[in-house]
């Protein structure tokens, strides 16, 4: 089946002939809106690999209620952004039989740069306010003052208790934290709540204090350049759409996310999620394909057959996806 991405009727014809649509065509704010509309109107589930939370906020506003009423699951952000953070937090919280107060994730990864991701940065002018809102994806009236106070963006360089490393800037924290917070809010509304005033933080993990300082400084400088008109000066030197890491880089890549969770009575657990293959390519392909297959083949998704809306991987796929990822050689471990 072939459909022009700008032709709603063609996209509706495509969506009407399938159960699940998986999209990897970004920037999604440019290419994805009509496709999601077609899926909602024609009754197809949807998943993608976006990290564009301002766009996802628009999907929630436009389509959540209709998708919910039809039992259609629209699940963005099912690549490296944001499954390790979202499903990893879900897995970690599932190890408790009591409410969890906070989870912090510490990311490590090795891989290459993507031209598609670079292009996305250049489509995000004018959305800074939305991107900076820690709860941009939350439903209305789901954030307490305590949660807001403990969820401000920022970072610290300090040795992490129980882990062999130092914390620093989390590269995709501003994308991933918002997704996990939406998961927590939807769990509170529809499934098993994480905890009354649950909060979530995301960080990089580095081998030494010096490495944490240098990497965090470099990342902050990069953020400054790419969030100002200076980005147009460096654009010729950045990967272009269609460019990506070599096969060797993809094969040698990996990611590890380590989660430190504390319950409301101060019980502490440490869990991890590990995948081999470049995070943005090989691992992302595995994560999003398993998400789509879960939507297509599973009859025991969380919430039951009639549950839908603009969801997250934790809320819409949950334990089904954890088990599929385990079978696909993504490792989940309880470390203490």
Which ranges hold each PLM region?
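Conserved Rossmann-fold cofactor-binding substructure of NAD(P)-dependent oxidoreductases
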Residues: 1-20, 24-31
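C-terminal catalytic/substrate-binding lobe primarily of soluble NAD(P)-dependent oxidoreductases
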Residues: 93-336
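Adenosine-phosphate binding glycine-rich loop
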Residues: 66, 70-110
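ADP-ribose/adenylate-binding Rossmann-like module
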Residues: 27, 36-56
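Rossmann-fold NAD(P)-binding glycine/threonine-rich loop
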Residues: 32, 50-72
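A generic structural signal for well-ordered alpha-helical segments
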Residues: 35-39, 63, 67, 325
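Short glycine/serine/threonine-rich phosphate/pyrophosphate-binding segments
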Residues: 30-32, 57-59, 81-87
């Amino acid at each position: 089946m072939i459909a022009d991405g700008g032709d709603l009727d063609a996209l509706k014809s495509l969506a009407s002939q399938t159960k699940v649509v998986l999209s990897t065509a970004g920037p999604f704010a440019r290419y994805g809106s009509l496709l999601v509309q077609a899926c909602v109107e024609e009754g197809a589930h949807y998943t993608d690999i976006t990290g564009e939370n301002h766009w996802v906020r628009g999907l929630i506003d436009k389509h959540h209620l209709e998708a919910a009423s039809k039992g259609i699951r629209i699940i963005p952000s099912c690549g490296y952004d944001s499954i390790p953070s979202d499903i990893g937090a879900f897995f970690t919280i599932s190890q408790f039989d009591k409410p969890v107060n906070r989870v912090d994730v510490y990311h490590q990864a090795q891989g290459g740069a993507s031209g598609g991701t670079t292009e996305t940065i250049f489509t995000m002018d004018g959305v800074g306010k939305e991107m900076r809102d820690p709860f941009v994806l939350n439903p209305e009236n789901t954030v307490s003052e305590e949660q807001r106070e403990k969820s401000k963006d920022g970072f610290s360089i300090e040795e992490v208790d129980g882990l062999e490393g130092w914390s620093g800037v989390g590269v995709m924290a501003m994308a991933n934290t918002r997704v996990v917070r939406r998961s927590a809010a939807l769990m509170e509304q529809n499934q098993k709540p994480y905890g009354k005033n649950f909060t979530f933080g995301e960080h990089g993990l580095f081998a030494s204090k010096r490495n944490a300082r240098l990497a965090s400084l470099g990342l902050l400088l990069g953020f400054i350049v790419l969030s100002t008109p200076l980005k147009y000066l460096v654009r010729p030197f950045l990967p272009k759409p269609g460019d990506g890491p070599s096969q060797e880089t993809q094969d040698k890549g990996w990611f590890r996310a380590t989660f430190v969770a504390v319950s409301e009575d101060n019980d502490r657990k440490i869990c991890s999620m590990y995948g081999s293959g470049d995070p943005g390519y090989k691992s992302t392909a595995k994560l999003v394909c398993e998400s789509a297959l879960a939507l297509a083949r599973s009859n025991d998704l969380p919430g039951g057959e009639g549950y839908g809306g603009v969801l997250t991987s934790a809320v819409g796929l949950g334990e089904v996806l954890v088990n599929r990822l385990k079978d696909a050689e993504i490792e989940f471990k309880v470390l203490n």
